[in-house]
């Protein structure tokens, strides 16, 4: 694992979906590096508040906000809370997502064809994984442009997951996220605002995984993304796609 020493003192970061899994790991890592971190939770504020309490022992801080990234007013409120810290936003991690469990609880063992999916569950995944990222990025980028700097980290998945049988709409939503990231990187070129992709590199122990996983499946620890997330907080380029399992190799 590469040694990533990052000083995030005086920085303000938003990590969506920061109450558990990958978001939790990134939020605590940023606070450990000195950042003021604001995390969102759409469904379980208690989890996010527990993460915030852990931040009390770190050089930085963690603040929990109940917010759904698909709701414009929630997004505005989340951004306003972050701006209360130091009047700016330096880093946005678009981590909040809805996985296949919202469409099919047993998606790993009993794949469901797309035509059998519930339309409302389908919409919820698309709204969170694509529209939510758009709303959050749209809300913070003007502030970053005014400051002449900023970093956006979009959390994605393996490309094989994007086209895997039974993984619709989750897989395709992440393919759309990656396409959006490349387009936005081009549009932000030369502004000082950078946008990149980060993924664990395999199935990860988060709330998105079904409870009875197939025998022999080993889950990655969410902490695996921490070195990459720290690196991207100070990114000076755009369009990178960091795969944690490969990037962490010595």
Residue ranges and their predicted role:
Residues 98, 111-134, 153, 177:
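Catalytic Tyr-X3-Lys loop
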Residues 19-20:
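Conserved glycine-rich cofactor-binding loop
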Residues 142, 185-187:
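Alpha-helical segment proximal to the catalytic Tyr-Lys
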Residues 137, 173:
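Active-site helix of classical SDR
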Residues 190, 197-199, 214-250:
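C-terminal helical subdomain
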Residues 33-50:
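Conserved glycine-rich Rossmann-like NAD(P)H-binding loop of the short-chain dehydrogenase/reductase
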Residues 76, 99-123, 146, 166-169:
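Conserved mid-core segment of classical short-chain dehydrogenase/reductases
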Residues 45, 66-78, 119:
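The beta1-alpha1 cofactor-binding region of Rossmann-like NAD(H)/NADP(H)-dependent oxidoreductases
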């Amino acid at each position: 694992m590469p040694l990533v020493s990052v000083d995030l003192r005086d920085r303000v970061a938003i990590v969506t979906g920061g109450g558990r899994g990958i978001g939790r790991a990134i939020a605590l890592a940023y606070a450990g590096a000195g950042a003021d971190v604001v995390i969102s939770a759409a469904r379980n504020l208690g989890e996010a508040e527990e993460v915030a309490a852990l931040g009390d022992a770190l050089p930085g801080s963690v603040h929990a906000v109940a917010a759904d990234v698909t709701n414009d007013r929630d997004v505005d409120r989340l951004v306003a809370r972050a701006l209360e810290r130091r009047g700016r936003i330096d880093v946005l991690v678009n981590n909040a997502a809805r996985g296949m469990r919202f469409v099919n609880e047993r998606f790993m063992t009993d794949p469901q064809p797309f035509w059998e999916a519930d339309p409302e569950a389908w919409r919820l995944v698309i709204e969170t994984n694509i529209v939510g990222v758009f709303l959050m990025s749209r809300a913070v980028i003007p502030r970053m442009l005014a400051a002449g700097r900023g970093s956006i980290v979009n959390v994605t998945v393996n490309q094989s997951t994007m086209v895997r049988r039974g993984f619709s709409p989750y897989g395709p939503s992440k393919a759309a996220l990656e396409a959006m990231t490349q387009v936005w990187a081009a549009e932000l070129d030369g502004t000082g605002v950078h946008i990149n992709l980060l993924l664990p590199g395999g199935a990860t122990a988060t709330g998105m995984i079904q409870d009875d996983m197939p025998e022999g499946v080993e889950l990655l620890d969410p902490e695996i993304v921490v070195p990459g997330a720290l690196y991207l907080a100070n990114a000076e380029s755009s369009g990178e796609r960091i795969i944690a399992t490969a990037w962490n190799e010595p």
